Amino acid sequence: MGRSEELFERAVKRIPGGVNSPVRAYGAIGMAPRFIKRADGCHIYDVDGNEYVDYIDSWGPMILGHNFPQIREAVVEACADGLSFGCATEIEVEMAEFICEHLPHVEMVRMV
């Protein structure tokens, strides 16, 4: 039994269906889901050491691939100020303005 199978057996005891999204359940495939440890570029690596080409891209947000250096650096820089405040921030205003300026049909933005 591989590490992914071991993790899945543990997960089903504490997480409904063993995964936090029905699409991750691999039900139609008839096998335990792969548990991913890391990713780089267009590749993901499971806890068993297998390498896969990532055609899922986290269902959209990883369009530039995983661990893209400029994005990683920007995230590290942003984290230095804190992660989540539960209050309004200047960068929210800047992001909303950027979106509205670049998508003329969008008048307002709400980020949740």
Each language-model region and where it sits:
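Short, flexible segments with low predicted structural confidence
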Residues: 15-16, 46-47, 70-71
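Active-site-adjacent loop/helix segments that line or gate small-molecule/cofactor pockets in enzymes
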Residues: 1-38, 92, 98
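Glycine-rich loop-to-alpha-helix module at the N-terminal edge of alpha/beta enzyme cores
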Residues: 51-112
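Fold-independent oxyanion-binding glycine-rich loops
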Residues: 19, 47, 59
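Active-site and channel-lining beta-strand-loop segments
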Residues: 34-54
